[in-house]
């Protein structure tokens, strides 16, 4: 409360310093309100500078009492909050008081009271005060951490309470006119800026044996660690290792372990995880974690203890990811393996004797966390022997079996299913490292039997309510998925003993059967999981069949059928992101490993138009598939039946395979930055195949066993494969090529010559760099090779020019033909238009009609034969009573010779025996059948 005494004192102070001050604006003041002034909203200033000056004075009688009195009145004045404008001076007063504590213990109370004020709201007079006084506020709050050095338990606890109050801001007890409370997060932000977290971490070293104060500091750090800025500051102050090493300190309340674990959690989440792990990866920290975990594992029975135990295990798992962490040296790895397997494998170790996990949520989570930590630990190879000693493989295999009826299970059905999936996933990581243990436990037989159950129609209701159970609700997809993943991991060890055992147990046939069963029952709902299962099956088959003809024969036509089924997938699905790309990669891998090299399978693949499907995929222009598809085609071209299939293929717009391959070559060269002109012609005949990368790289001397840049270029792009395919198809007989294709084909045809020239050129340049002088004959040979390579380039460039010129001429001729057609079309249109105009003129103008008729008659008359044949019948062209305004068309109906003259229908059809009448008209019957010689005189027709 603002008191009358405080008001009177303030007035006295004001009158006392009036003559010393040059202006009132230079005096930092705070409004001191008396009971009378409060009603009038009038503030009385208090001279804080005088208080500071008073505290700085020494060696005066009664000075201590006076100083304490002024500080007490100061506390009374600010009991409703601290104005930001006065904060710097108030904390200076606090600092002066704390400096006197050592010689004048009575100042502890004054410092305590001022610190208590810091828990009150900060007040601002203007909105801009938060920004204006930000630096002063940050420095003032940072001073709280420095005051932790004062050896006063009461003072330290009050400092901690004050900081905790930052996170639980309360409104002012009383409204002060003209002031408003600073934002609730202002103190927290200023604590971050001032670096309070660092001094609080450092204060931990002063509290080794002072539990109460240590717990308060941990509470403060717990609040501070909710901020990323503070976590970074704490991490740099080595907070992680400092807190972790004291986890085992005696604490009946249990707060130390709880608060410490939460601080470690926050540091791992909100600061540099790698740096925090590095701080915790020392023997002292791991020993502390080990002891805490063992105590909680063996003696923790409450929900709180079990949850804390799991948190410690998660932190340990994160530390175990660091290969430099001495997990084995401190014995933690051995204990974790024991705790992970004691439920499944009996152990006489005293640590687990009489222990049993319940089916509570915390113990269930613990079991999964222990499986997870085994996966992390097995990445450190020295751990392998401990895994063998702990019989981890045997313990995990206890879950790889179908559910048994009438058996008492410690876990619920859902829990057992999740643990089963987790165990199989763990085996996928551990089994490849412990392959001998895996085989001794009959691992292949167990997994194949479990897969057989997964494929069966046995009733089983899966819950699918976990990460590993994703996509497996109401079916066995999750179990099948992880079992196949385990088999894939084992197969890809390429251990012949393991793979032979799998093949003898009929794995190839079983995998093909599972695949066929899956594709016969489409499941769109779980499509992503099904695609992963299919991919794993194909990868397992590839691993088993590679380099084994007999196994490829077992793969046979049924295997080819499933491969072809995948290759017929709608290309649009390749962009769906559901795993079709992975499935297609697996399919192409299975073609390489399971079909190529086995002639019956190759022939069946060709018979079923497999090459067409490969070329269809190649035409999709997916760069990630091109290299693999072309490699497969190179091998397939060794089969004499392949060329006919390749040449018979047609893509969009009747594109041929040769045209497609040449197009891919051009695209590859464009991406590689090979120099070509606009027509695709060689520019640099000395370096016709050089890429932009080769241009940038300088030739350096290399050991004989290191491939040069020119050699590496062969394997790093698809040009060599395209050359090999076109070479096997015969360069001279490639159908469906354009002139542009032929220009590119000239380069492809000489690819090997150019590449040999490149390599010799590198050899020559290396000799120069090493300053070697070859003998005369070698030098001449090198020069001859270089010249020959350049001449080949010039020859190819010349041939390309001829092709381009020939095509240009052909294009010119084609253009002229098209132009001639256009001219003829235009001329025909003009004639048609003129004819139409004439027709309109005749039908609309009588004079024009008469003129046209006159011209027609003249034309008819001019076309007649003027010498009339003897005995010929003359037909009139004019028919009486007929009026027409148009000329006759191409079809004219004419009344011929009357029937009386014809003599009836033609009875005899053997015209060759008849004598034709010379009078014209229709055929007539003649009586004589005697054949006479034709008259020798000429008869007009």
Swiss-Prot record:
Residues 16-26 have a biased composition (Polar residues). Residues 1-26 are annotated as: Disordered. Keywords: Cell projection, Cilium, Differentiation, Flagellum, Olfaction, Sensory transduction, Spermatogenesis. Pfam families: CFA69_ARM_rpt. It comes from the Eukaryota. The keyword Acetylation does not apply. Cilium- and flagellum-associated protein. In the olfactory epithelium, regulates the speed of activation and termination of the odor response and thus contributes to the robustness of olfactory transduction pathways. Required for sperm flagellum assembly and stability. GO terms for biological process: flagellated sperm motility; olfactory behavior; positive regulation of fertilization; positive regulation of flagellated sperm motility; response to odorant; sensory perception of smell; sperm axoneme assembly. GO terms for cellular component: cytoplasm; non-motile cilium; sperm midpiece. It is linked to Spermatogenic failure 24: An autosomal recessive infertility disorder caused by spermatogenesis defects that result in multiple morphologic abnormalities of the flagella, including absent, short, coiled, bent, and irregular-caliber flagella. Malformations of the sperm head have also been observed. In addition, patients exhibit very low sperm concentrations and total sperm counts per ejaculate. Highly expressed in the testis, specifically in sperm (at protein level). Expressed in the brain, kidney, liver, lung, and intestine. This is Cilia- and flagella-associated protein 69. It is found in: Cell projection, Cilium; Cell projection, Cilium, Flagellum. Its main location: other. Residues 1-14 have a biased composition (Low complexity). Transmembrane segments: none annotated. InterPro entries: ARM-like (IPR011989), ARM-type_fold (IPR016024), CFA69 (IPR048732), CFA69_ARM_dom (IPR048733).
